[in-house]
Amino acid sequence: MNIITWLAEPNWTGGVTETLDWKTDVLQSPTGAEQRIARRLSPRRTFEFSILLADNDRQRLENAVFHAGAARWAMPVFSDVYVLPEDIAAGGNIITLDTVGRDFSAGGKLLLKDGLAMNARSSLIDIENVTSDGLNLSAPLAERWPAGAILYPVRHAVLTDPPDFTRYNTSLSAAQIRFRVDEHNAFSDDIAALPRYRSHPILEPDSNWSESVTGQYLRLLLELDNGSGLVARTDTARRPFVMQAHTWMPFGRDEQAALRSLFYFLRGRQRAIWVSSPNHDFYPVSGMNGNVIDVENAGFADFGIVPGRRDLRIRRTDGSCIYRRITAATVLSEAVERLLLDGSAISLEIDDIESLSFITLCRQESDSVEWQHTTDGDGLASVSTTFRGIRDELESV
């Protein structure tokens, strides 16, 4: 059977959920040392959305699903929609548009539609190559397409499950649709814009506070319990591992493309990145003129300096950041303790310091990332993940 084009538009009241799934083998010792091996060249992608169809649209979709439910579909990437601002004449083989952040690929396909209905005029067109400002088509357009026509990148995909239709009456139905992209999913992993510290990138900006940020200090505990005596417990790593949730709400195609590049760099659980605590971990009581800063006594010096809690981000009020390692800490009084930092001297007035926060070398806790497209890529999305601390002294730092 030929590939069938999916023509039913999503119901955007619930958005479109895109899931990126990497596969990583994490070989962890009882001490927390890790070897991480990526098993996929690119992530598997799934798209999930709801539809609400009536009358002829419902009839057309149910006929298509009945006959081709197990086949490969030409699935429009709905979050990368583009509306033609002007007419395109028949015979042309170039479509001018901003392709950055849109899922076009050389040798791939695009879908042109002259409306939202399933019976609207549509055409599946081959792409020869992609530039930053347009698409070169494999053959000239056979028809004229007016301003307002809709253009989508297309991916070959399969339905992961048969749609379960909810029938509200004789002509109106809803269903939840889930596609899995059935081809390689390449994307740039360039994160050169991010700062670096000790050979690894640093995650910026901070988590979005539209919802509470969660965290914990995970221990690798081994318990022996014979059921009658006391339980014997061993902390095999003899240190905690930070677990830190992080949420982004990127707006616009540039922010979303940069965030996608970050996830492609991280490759699920494989690669490491420095992640800042969301807290003000110290309150300064002095400025800096050298490598020493005095802070309110937070009990840090009492426990000593240990891996995983010795690297500091100093954020200035202008938004710029300085990253340093704490090399010594001493208690000056009940109210003040002093931190000695490595690196070059720093000159800062106390009013120039916005926050002092720990940073921890982390990897993602999961290989799966959910990307909630609230609107198309020119608007708002929401993405959340959880980072897990690793033993930075054993990484290449």
State each model region's role.
Residues L52-E143, S188-D190, R196-W209, R253-G343, ...:
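Autoprocessing Asn-cyclization modules and mimics
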Residues S199-G252:
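Conserved small-residue-rich
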Residues A232, G287-N291, N297-G299, E349-G377, ...:
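Low-complexity, acidic Ser/Thr/Pro-rich "mucin-like" tracts of secreted and single-pass surface proteins
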